[in-house]
């Protein structure tokens, strides 16, 4: 799941900085008016530059789940969503999207929305794996295992945070 990241702003067109090459940035995609959202981070809010949150963030969590569970590639994928809540925003990527990745023995569900409150504030971007021995919650910063019996186990992703402390946001 993932919550937020899609910009809700509606800034007016602006003159790009002198160092910004709009042709190079846009490539073969349709040209959009430059705004404060174009660069550096909010470009993810536009289909012309990205594939939305599912193409930007889901791929990382899905790969993590596939790796942990040794799933291989999904056999089928279905998805639904759209711009259902933040209709006034300049962004044109979905503010709500759910997808089902069907594997041989199980389905992996992805859900994101860029509005509201995350159901689990400790894991606004992460994965939850429910198993017969307990539940594993994980993100790029931490993980928690909550066994059916016994005490929970928690760990932070210390190597990356020691090596790159600026990643802790």
Where would I find each of the regions flagged by the language model?
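Contiguous beta-strand/loop segments that form the cofactor/metal-binding neighborhood of enzyme cores
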Residues: 1-52, 56-169
């Amino acid at each position: 799941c993932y919550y937020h990241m899609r910009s809700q702003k509606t800034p007016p067109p602006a003159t790009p900085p002198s160092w910004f090459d709009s042709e190079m940035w846009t490539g073969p995609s349709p040209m959009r008016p430059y705004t404060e959202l174009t660069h550096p981070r909010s470009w993810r809010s536009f289909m012309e530059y990205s594939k939305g949150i599912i193409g930007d963030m889901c791929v990382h969590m899905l790969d993590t789940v596939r790796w942990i569970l040794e799933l291989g590639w999904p056999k089928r994928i279905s998805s639904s969503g759209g711009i259902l809540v933040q209709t006034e925003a300049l962004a044109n990527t979905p503010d709500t999207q759910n997808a089902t990745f069907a594997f041989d023995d199980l389905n992996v569900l992805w859900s994101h929305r860029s509005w509201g409150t995350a159901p689990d504030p400790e894991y606004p971007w992460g994965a939850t794996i429910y198993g017969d021995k307990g539940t594993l919650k994980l993100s790029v910063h931490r993980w928690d295992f909550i066994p059916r019996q016994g005490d929970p186990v928690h760990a932070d992703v210390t190597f990356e945070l020691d090596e790159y402390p600026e990643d802790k946001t």
